[in-house]
């Protein structure tokens, strides 16, 4: 998955602190690897809206079988991740491969709807996203076969063995678990935005940790079947 952004230089607080002004690489910055990895894996919109820190930086790190890269020249920024050692194959099994081109500067945001006041030499384009979904050809293993489906403890939902392993790694099977750092919650450690995309209407906007186990299981199965195991860093 690779994202390339051309937009404002506003930073979001994602746990990255520049070691020196201007340019920072992996050795010059203190990186919250777990949080950045979780945001990248879940295709969090905040990574597209703004860079992870102000100024130019070049941050690359490996985390749990994937290599992550975040880069900015101070104006344009990009981020991507791939399975370690298989960067060229990642696009083939990725649930989502998106390219975002945003040519709106911070000074132009307020005047996007006032085309009559645009400078003749400036071209303003609203952010556009092209998303391509590829079938999961390598990400899932034989563990996801129907012969291995079993209802999880305390739930009537059939959860395949791969998802059960993910739940154990993410939360130890605790349906009320909450990560105070990233805000991920529940048995499968959903981010709120991801949860809202797969949860039943009555549980949208509610913390996953407050939903019954069978509701969490059903949401996880839906996400697994539509987006693949790559949605979880521990997969």
Curated annotation (Swiss-Prot):
Q: What class of enzyme is it?
A: hydrolase
Keywords (alphabetical) are: Glycosidase, Hydrolase, Secreted, Signal
Output compositional bias ranges, type Polar residues.
Answer: 99-110
- Would I find Hydrolase among this entry's keywords? yes
Question: Signal peptide location in the record?
Answer: 1-26
Gene3D superfamilies of this UniProt entry? Answer: 1.10.530.10
Report biased composition (Low complexity) as residue ranges: 111-159
Q: Which SUPFAM superfamilies match?
A: Lysozyme-like (SSF53955)
Task: Say which domain of life the source belongs to.
Answer: Bacteria
Q: Where in the cell is it found?
A: Secreted
Supply one GO molecular-function term.
hydrolase activity, acting on glycosyl bonds
Q: What is its EC number?
A: 3.2.-.-
One GO location term (cellular component): extracellular region
Q: What is its main location?
A: secreted
In terms of InterPro entries, this protein maps to: Lysozyme-like_dom_sf, RPF
Nucleus keyword on record: no
Q: Where is this region: Disordered?
A: 90-159
What role does it play?
A: Is able to cleave peptidoglycan and affects clumping and separation of bacterial cells.
Q: Which family does it belong to?
A: Belongs to the transglycosylase family. SceD subfamily.
Protein's UniProt name: Probable transglycosylase SceD
Its gene name is sceD
């Amino acid at each position: 998955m690779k994202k390339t952004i051309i937009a404002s230089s506003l930073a979001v607080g994602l746990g990255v602190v520049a070691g020196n002004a201007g340019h920072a690489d992996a050795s010059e910055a203190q990186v919250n690897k777990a949080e950045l990895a979780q945001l990248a894996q879940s295709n969090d919109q905040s990574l597209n809206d703004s860079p992870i820190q102000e100024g130019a930086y070049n941050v690359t790190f490996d985390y749990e079988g994937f290599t992550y890269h975040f880069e900015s020249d101070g104006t344009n920024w990009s981020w991507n991740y791939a399975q370690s050692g298989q960067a060229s194959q990642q696009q083939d099994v990725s649930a989502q491969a998106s390219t975002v081109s945003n040519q709106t500067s911070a000074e132009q945001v307020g005047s996007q709807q006032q085309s009559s006041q645009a400078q003749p030499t400036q071209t303003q384009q609203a952010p556009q996203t092209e998303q391509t979904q590829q079938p999961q050809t390598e990400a899932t293993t034989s563990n996801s076969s129907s012969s291995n489906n079993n209802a999880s403890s305390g739930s009537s939902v059939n959860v395949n063995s791969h998802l059960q392993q993910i739940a154990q790694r993410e939360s130890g099977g605790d349906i009320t678990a909450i990560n105070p750092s990233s805000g991920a919650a529940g048995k499968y450690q959903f981010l709120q935005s991801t949860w809202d995309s797969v949860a039943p209407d009555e549980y949208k906007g509610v913390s996953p940790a407050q939903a019954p186990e069978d509701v969490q299981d059903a949401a996880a199965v839906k996400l697994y079947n539509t987006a693949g195991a790559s949605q979880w860093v521990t997969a």
